[in-house]
Design a protein with these regions (language model features):
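Small-residue-rich helix-loop
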Residues: 275, 331-338
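Hydrophobic, glycine- and aromatic-enriched re-entrant/interface helices and adjoining loop segments
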Residues: 96-100, 195-318, 342
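Interfacial segments of multi-pass membrane proteins
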Residues: 163, 168-184, 191-194, 291-314, ...
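Helix-loop-helix junctions and helix-breaking kinks within/between transmembrane helices
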Residues: 147-182, 187-215, 237-240, 244-245
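Hydrophobic alpha-helical transmembrane segments
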Residues: 51-56, 115, 312-332
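Membrane-helix boundary/helix-loop-helix interface segments in multi-pass membrane proteins
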Residues: 1-17, 21-22, 28-166, 170, ...
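Loop-to-helix entry and N-terminal half of a specific, functionally important transmembrane alpha helix
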Residues: 335-373
Length: 407
């Protein structure tokens, strides 16, 4: 099958161009971010990222020309293998889950593969499920398929990545035509947990929820179920808070008030905001960022790589990067909408949700609008597993676009 095929190839080529642009930006920024590092090993990170780019492009080409039917047939097998690999990390870590398997110079981060596995298994199940969108059993199966890997990743502990599964879950269910009241059931317990930090705010939220349920009239059973779940969510908040790791609690508290620990947990957010703000409209210039070169920004090649972009290339540089991401998301939605094969459509939507969620969270961290969760910026942040998975997702979207007429 030729890569260029009339008008259908234009979207694929544009998606490829956006991905390549972001990856090159990542390599350039990683080089700048670590150029002043006293470690020669860190200075060469950009060279390793170039090697990962070659591997990622190879994976992209393979995925583009691989029959989508193959992913559909082996969806459950891939999911089972990934779950076993996640469980195996607990034995590897001696009771405490590690986050990757080491193969010489290469570390395999299983949670990255788990994102794809969840997308495939949800797409497979929803494509062949004959139950109505509002079926309780169908809803329960989908929750189980997402909850298993999500809880295993959360146990590592990796809160940021576990939230990606939630984004996939909500987006794919919405695309499957889940009625509004059911979406309310998914989202409202999270709001209830947040609101329960202050008793008065939780009472107001719960009353508003009851009024909304009365207005929507989803049925007695659903209304009672939603009310009970939200009631329990509010009650168990102290238990959930106590189960969080100390650094996770501090990240949340510092997100609300960075000045609480300016030299500790709040240091990252404060320095990141200084870097982005000091970049102005046009930036300080390549390799001229003071916050970057003086290493005031921690994890500047991974979690806070957007801060380096903001400082060195300014507001317009950051906007250009965000436009590239927006193009990928919008073109992906267009592909998902026109796909005749529902499996392909679900896969594209799931992939888009991963990229969009990680961009929002990562950029939000750099701007101090989100708590620090450790999620990388797709295509840009340093890391082989993340880069390859980003390109695999892009390959799946292009694959679906090339074969959108197939059932």
């Amino acid at each position: 099958m030729p890569l260029i095929r009339g008008n259908l190839s234009k979207i694929g080529l544009l998606l490829f161009a956006c991905g390549l642009f972001l990856t090159i930006v990542g390599i350039v920024v990683i080089h700048s971010a670590l150029s002043a590092s006293p470690s020669k090993y860190e200075q060469d990170y950009y060279l390793r990222q170039m090697i990962w780019m070659m591997a990622a492009l190879a994976a992209f080409i393979v995925v583009v020309f691989m029959p989508m039917r193959l992913f559909e047939v082996f969806a459950y097998v891939v999911f089972a293998v990934v779950v076993l690999m996640l469980v195996g990390l607990f034995f590897k870590g001696g009771g405490k889950a590690a986050r990757w398997y080491s193969f010489g110079l290469f570390n395999l981060q299983v949670s990255e593969i788990a994102k794809l596995a969840v997308i495939f298994v949800l797409a497979r199940y929803l494509t062949y499920s004959r139950r109505p969108a509002n079926s309780v059993l169908r809803f329960g199966v989908v929750i189980s398929l997402v909850a298993i890997p999500m809880l295993l990743v959360l146990r590592q502990p990796d809160l940021g990545t576990s939230l990606v599964f939630l984004a996939i879950f909500i987006t794919v269910l919405f695309w499957s035509g889940l009625p509004g009241p059911y979406m309310l059931l998914i989202i409202s317990p999270v709001i209830s947990l947040i609101a329960s930090s202050h008793p008065a705010s939780w009472v107001v939220f719960f009353v508003l929820l009851l009024v909304l349920l009365q207005f929507l009239k989803p049925g007695t059973v659903f209304s009672i179920t939603t009310s009970v779940i939200n009631l329990l969510s509010g009650i168990i908040m102290p238990f959930v808070w106590n189960r969080l790791q100390d650094y996770q609690k501090m990240r949340i508290l510092v997100f609300l008030d960075p000045g609480r620990d300016p030299l500790g947990a709040g240091y990252q957010i404060i320095q990141s905001k200084i870097a982005v703000g000091s970049g102005g409209l046009w930036g300080k210039g390549y390799m001229a960022g003071t916050q970057t070169n003086l290493a005031f920004i921690p994890e500047r090649h991974t979690d806070f790589v957007f801060s380096v972009i903001g400082e060195e290339f300014g507001f317009w540089g950051g906007i250009l990067v965000l436009i590239a991401f927006a193009a990928i998301v919008l073109l992906g939605i267009r592909v998902a909408y026109k796909c005749r094969n529902m499996f392909s459509s679900y896969v594209v939507v799931g992939g888009i949700s991963v990229i969009a969620f990680q961009v929002v969270v990562n950029v939000g961290m750099a701007l101090g609008l989100m708590p620090v969760t450790g999620l990388p910026l797709p295509f840009v942040s340093y890391g082989g597993s993340s880069l390859i998975m980003s390109w695999v997702i892009l390959g799946l979207i292009v694959n679906a676009e090339l074969n959108w007429q197939e059932y």
